[in-house]
Amino acid sequence: MKVEKTNLEGVLKIILDAFEDYRGHYVETYNEGLYNKHGIDIKFIQDDISVSNKNVLRGIHGDQETWKLISCLEGEFYLVVINNDENSLQYKQWESFTLSEQNRIQILVPPKFGNGHLVLSERAIFHYKQNTYYNPDGQFTILWNDPEFNIEWPIKRPILSERDKVGHFVD
């Protein structure tokens, strides 16, 4: 396992090791002791999976208290992480990553950050661990095309949920 800093303070890129042979491959997706050795001391208490088809864009969602560990179990998606912490020097900055079942990348997203993903393959399975239980009342939704961020999405007309169509612009 390799852990790398990203351009956003607090966001980490984790590249998982794989054991491969003629039968296929094996990947350990989480081991608390190993993550602790890399300075990631977060107690995750909820896991969620989202299955989406090509051109579906989910997000940008976040809250004030949740750490998320995001990975792709199948397919490929374009992930955007946004710093939504008004007290941060990096407020409104974003970074993108491509996650796939082949590259075995995980992204650790801190509280006060938002994330959204666009499915690039025919289908993708998005998996994330959280250190808090989901609280719909504490969520924020930022519009995927908010001009304040000028995010470079590789699509002009994604498939969106009603929630994501009515997100808000950031002032």
Q: In which residue ranges do the predicted regions lie?
A:
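Conserved metal-binding segment of the jelly-roll/cupin
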Residues: L99-E122
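Non-catalytic, conserved peripheral segments adjacent to functional cores
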Residues: M1-Q102, R123, Y128-D171
